Amino acid sequence: MYRMPMRFWLTAVVMVVVGALLLDTASASYIENTCRGVMGNRDIYKKVVRVCEDCTNIFRLPGLDGMCRDRCFNNEWFLVCLKAANRDDELDKFKVWISILNPGL
């Protein structure tokens, strides 16, 4: 029976780990790059993202989370989600937070 050298297996494992780390970093930066003002405002970002997460849990629609986050929460889906999460009374606060996450708009 043919045995693969230990060096081959070690190289394969290292490549898989590095690939997984790069993929994870790339997907995280894609999410964060949709909002230019995230850096330094992660606490605000987490509060706004929570609305989209709650909405996704309420409706269970595929892709709803992405539609809610589209254009850094500056869209109609976010407003629908805010209402669905019974947080529409906080609309003014969320508008301020979204403007902080979207500097220059």
Swiss-Prot record:
Chief site of localization: secreted
Gene Ontology CC annotation, any one: extracellular region
Subcellular location: Secreted
Disulphide connectivity of cysteines: C35-C72, C52-C68, C55-C81
Organ and tissue specificity: Expressed in the postmolt, intermolt, and premolt stages of the shrimp eyestalks and the brain.
Keywords: Disulfide bond, Hormone, Neuropeptide, Secreted, Signal
Keyword Disulfide bond applies: yes
Domain of life: Eukaryota
A biological process from GO: neuropeptide signaling pathway
Gene3D superfamilies tied to this protein: Crustacean CHH/MIH/GIH neurohormone
InterPro entries noted in UniProt: Crust_neurhormone_CS, Crust_neurohorm, Crust_neurohorm_sf, Hyperglycemic, Hyperglycemic2
UniProt-recorded Gene Ontology molecular function terms: neuropeptide hormone activity
Signal sequence coordinates: 1-28
UniProt record similarity statement: Belongs to the arthropod CHH/MIH/GIH/VIH hormone family.
Function statement: Inhibits Y-organs where molting hormone (ecdysteroid) is secreted. A molting cycle is initiated when MIH secretion diminishes or stops.
Name this protein carries in UniProt: Probable molt-inhibiting hormone
